[in-house]
């Protein structure tokens, strides 16, 4: 399939999904700590990309997708396929439509067929990989590369009280403010660093005089 995208991770651990060709790799290397080239791109700035009409693009099959919302949130999507009557899969256009419906702004296709597997530490394989032809969780194929997502601290420190405010040093911490704020409660935050929020859509937490 066409490799025209990249999943890139910066020094703060923020993930970006963007269009990228071979000539752009040097710029990506300079800007990010880690990157994985993949493709094809499904969504760019909320718009469905155009695809060739080759069978690999128009055929319904299992798909794996990673995307970023307008707020910078990463989303992982696996579409089961090739199991008639249980999972028919998706064409690339259909996968792009699903990704957009879920709220992704930029999205790229990772893998198809039995390589499309989603695993969690609590439940193991949660989708139905097609490698064994059965609608179960045992048909995952062998792959050389995985994307591993681990939980990190919401902030650099603090507990949100006036004497021990949450410490914010990067844009991930800024986004995490929404995770802790509850109605009719007071929270305290302290900026410990200048934070570049370029390209991140803002959502107000509250309004006041």
Locations of regions flagged by a protein language model:
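Surface-exposed repetitive/solenoidal architectures
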Residues: 153-209
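Gly/Ser/Thr/Pro-rich low-complexity, intrinsically disordered segments
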Residues: 1-152
